[in-house]
Amino acid sequence: MSSHGNSLFLRESGAGGGCLQGLQDSLQQRALRTRLRLQTMTREHVRRFLRRNAFILLTVSAVIIGVSLAFALRPYQLSYRQIKYFSFPGELLMRMLQMLVLPLIVSSLVTGMASLDNKATGRMGMRAAVYYMVTTVIAVFIGILMVTIIHPGKGSKEGLHREGRIETVPTADAFMDLVRNMFPPNLVEACFKQFKTQYSTRVVTRTIVRTDNGSELGASMSPTSSVENETSILENVTRALGTLQEVISFEETVPVPGSANGINALGLVVFSVAFGLVIGGMKHKGRVLRDFFDSLNEAIMRLVGIIIWYAPVGILFLIAGKILEMEDMAVLGGQLGMYTLTVIVGLFLHAGGVLPLIYFLVTHRNPFPFIGGMLQALITAMGTSSSSATLPITFRCLEEGLGVDRRITRFVLPVGATVNMDGTALYEALAAIFIAQVNNYELNLGQITTISITATAASVGAAGIPQAGLVTMVIVLTSVGLPTEDITLIIAVDWFLDRLRTMTNVLGDSIGAAVIEHLSQRELELQEAELTLPSLGKPYKSLMAQEKGASRGRGGNESVM
């Protein structure tokens, strides 16, 4: 991994020996350096420290001030309109970040795919897919384990407060919409709309043929006298005429094509990956397009550098506004409080234990300085509750703060922000079992396995939009026959938990980029060598080839001798 600039959150190089010994030595060295710095600290050192870490310090201060300001204003019981006015600076930050998401996803993916050959891209893509799958499955397992051990749903659901309304979506239609959105028929429309199945009713009419006694027409005829036969025939004809005029009408719900507002991130990711691979395969013919998207990406990142100074102000008002919107803080107590605590513990174990452990086992480096370098993006994720809106800040932290290779971040981050949702998968599995517990519904091993698989698959469709977990949770509940209307029991705390699971999602994407970069060092070095070699010129390359052949000949002679 490339070297990093001087910062408060430098990554420690892994020492030799065992993994735990290396981590212990790294922490001891850092403590010793910190002690020496404190002893020799001057006013100039303090000034340089503040200048280097201004973004992080301002953002952390904004969170503290926002929470304090919100609780100070709650006794005044502001109206909904006043709260919206108060939250306006935070809304501006969301709009600024969302403005940059679309060009950033397209430009970064196209340049990332075009800068790598197909073989290297395939290997990196396979590593990314394995990482996404492993971390998501572990997250689901942690969620199921926590809700089973703590058992927050013990008791009756009568004491829980319902809030909002949930739209029921058939599982098959939801997954078909996911696949449809991967291939948008109109790229311009994909920039502001997603395909979403709507439902309509139509009147269906059917004619039912039956006799008065429920038997089929003519079934009761028997061979008797001619008079009786004629009477029977007349009766049957009369019944038949009456029956043919009987028509039953009923309403049927049918799916119809529809749309929902919002960027179709999944479709743009699929198109950008394919487009970038094609440009990369065109070699010098695609250089103009590659340079265009590279310049576009650079321009977007410079805009991010400007907007980032406004981020602390926006985060302050976003967090304060959300706390002021809560009607009753008492909902965090009791049964719902235990549910909230269970989710927090699960997310903390995954984000603070599993992900750093994966980073350490793969790279043999101390993960906590790396996480510290991501603090700006993590706090922004908490404020915006959207991994897609946090994407510009995540790029900046990884590339400029931590020095992760741009070819990796441009490939991994946009895809990860769309399909890698560890926090959402953990939350959906945990919430589904919680709803089963409050309904006194015993789940068997097969149903728990179904929840695990469905939560893993449904998290892919969450697409980084705020509170998407509530929408995809309908799929998880439907898969095991749990009542979808009981999602309203947990909406009261979802705004808070949504921010925590977004932080987990962003951290998972960031650590994934670092892990994939470490595993792809050989491909990256070979790619750099191939890009450098053409600039040397044909005479020099032929000379290198001759020297290489001569050295092979000498090596063969030496081996014979």
Curated annotation (Swiss-Prot):
It is a multi-pass membrane protein. Na(+) 2 binds at residue 418. The chain crosses the membrane at residues 53-73, 96-116, 130-150, 259-282, 292-319, 341-362, 408-434, 495-516. Residues 1-52 are cytoplasmic. Pfam families: SDF (PF00375). The keyword Nucleus does not apply. Na(+) 1 binds at residues 416, 420, 505, 509. One of its GO terms (biological process) is L-glutamate import across plasma membrane. GO terms for cellular component: glutamatergic synapse; Golgi apparatus; intermediate filament cytoskeleton; membrane; plasma membrane; presynaptic membrane. The keyword Cell membrane applies. Brain specific. It is found in: Cell membrane. InterPro entries: DAACS (IPR050746), Na-dicarboxylate_symporter (IPR001991), Na-dicarboxylate_symporter_CS (IPR018107), Na:dicarbo_symporter_sf (IPR036458). L-aspartate binds at residues 385-387, 424, 465-469, 498, 505. Residues 368-398, 448-481 dip into the membrane without crossing it. PANTHER family: EXCITATORY AMINO ACID TRANSPORTER 4, SODIUM/DICARBOXYLATE SYMPORTER-RELATED. Contains eight transmembrane regions plus two helical hairpins that dip into the membrane. These helical hairpin structures play an important role in the transport process. The first enters the membrane from the cytoplasmic side, the second one from the extracellular side. During the transport cycle, the regions involved in amino acid transport, and especially the helical hairpins, move vertically by about 15-18 Angstroms, alternating between exposure to the aqueous phase and reinsertion in the lipid bilayer. In contrast, the regions involved in trimerization do not move. This is Excitatory amino acid transporter 4. The gene is Slc1a6.
